[in-house]
Amino acid sequence: MVEGRAAPRGRTLAASSPAGTIAGLGRFNAIMALVHLVQAVALLLLSRDFRLPVTLSYLKFDPATTSLRPMVTTVAEVPLAWLVVAFLLLSSLAHLTIATVYRPRYERDLLRGLNRARWIEYAVSASVMIVAIAMLVGIYDLGALLMLFSLVAVMNLLGLLMEVHNQTTRQTDWLSFWIGSLAGIVPWIVVAISLWASSSYGDGQIPAFVYWIYVSIFIFFSCFAVNMWLQYRRIGPWASYLYGERAYIVLSLVAKSALAWQVFAGTLRPV
């Protein structure tokens, strides 16, 4: 160990966290796998066939005006229910994996103040969530959707980097946190611009549930960053990494459930 370097976070955690608490998290993951799966199956069975287009924008030469004109073509129509079911199933699979085959590695990582599996799952499931929200507000361009997906994925992978990198630092290095926060806020700005454009230049008839989705899921996404901040500041019960881990699991369930059932109530329920 480099002289003057503080002990790794995991050593303090290992000394202060009873094994029973870690075992409890294993069982909690198994329960969460079932809860997400039940919701996914219910939504798949109950939802009507509501599809949104995926488009491509391109330039085409107009011989009449001898200029290039922007064009849009629809390349696919995606059932919205599939997107909702996808992020629920991804979470269910991740929790099941953590509770079973990955559990020994998961428990070792928890003792070090680390959870790789969480960030990898979020990098995919949260990215699908933002794509669903973007399509609800009228963002259909494939390139734009891919960029939004990628930004949220990068945000979560920087969360992974934050935990891995700070295994070896004397003091918490917040660079990954702030870059991840920057990447994570951009999709919400893009969605807000689309909402504003629809209100200003469209017919202004944006369903109220779309605004509720935007506000509620933005708040939930922000709570993940707050949870990490509290963990690394060791404030109150967050002094134990396991408390923050349980908070992540609960936040993930609530955020995904809130989005899924708001989308169902607004667009997918049978009429």
Give residue ranges: language-model regions.
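Polytopic alpha-helical membrane-helix bundles and their juxtamembrane interface segments
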Residues: 3-34, 38-115, 126-271
